[in-house]
Amino acid sequence: EPNSADAQYRFAIAASYLAEVGQELHDKTLAFSAAESGIPAAERAVALNANSAEYNRILGTLCGQAISGNGLAALKYGKCALNSVNRAIELDPKSSDAFLSQGVGYFYLPSALGGGVDMAVKDFQKALELNPKSAEAYLWLGIAMRRTNRNPEARKALESALELNPNRLWAKQQLDKIPPK
């Protein structure tokens, strides 16, 4: 349904989930191709309803996921990731998911291109302020803390993620990467 924003959005969400599976399996080719396959659908959803914070968020998320699957894609998709998620936040400043998506984008975008782990951490914390039950925000906060060698904080965040979503394999894998106390 090319003229249904909702149908385009649902396709984009499916592509984003597949890209996340690729990330969890450490299959960058799958992560990149899945994310890239969803971008046109997300762009179409935004074109059909530019005032939807969620449609803008998923577009930014997919652009960020494409970057995570292929670092060179930052040149092509970096601006899309930042602008789309910024637009989502502008449309809905209380969206925990929008701040989470922005944080993931910053996590993968090199500091030289306007991203970085420190900026990501701020967004993950904001996402948790808006939704303290966000297992995904705790997961990403833990990943970011581990990246900066803040292992006690990383462990705490990942344990919180697993409390909220005990079946999340990626959170378990991330927790296993942290040296014991």
Feature-to-residue mapping (PLM):
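Mid-chain, structured segments of secreted extracytoplasmic proteins
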Residues: D6-N56
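Short coil/turn linking the two alpha-helices of tandem helical-hairpin repeats
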Residues: A12, Y17-H26, G60, Q65-A74, ...
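Structural signature of tandem alpha-helical TPR/SEL1-like repeats
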Residues: G22-A41, G71-R87, A112-K126, R147-S160
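Helix-start (N-cap) detector for alpha-helical repeat units in TPR-like alpha-solenoids
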Residues: A5-D6, A53-E54, S96-D97, A135-E136, ...
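Short coil turns that delineate tetratricopeptide repeat
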Residues: P2-N3, A50, P93, P132, ...
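Alpha-helical adaptor scaffolds
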Residues: L59-Q65, G78, N86-R87, D92-E129, ...
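Terminal, low-structured helical/coil segments at or just beyond the last alpha-helical repeat
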Residues: D118, E136, W140-I143, R147-K181
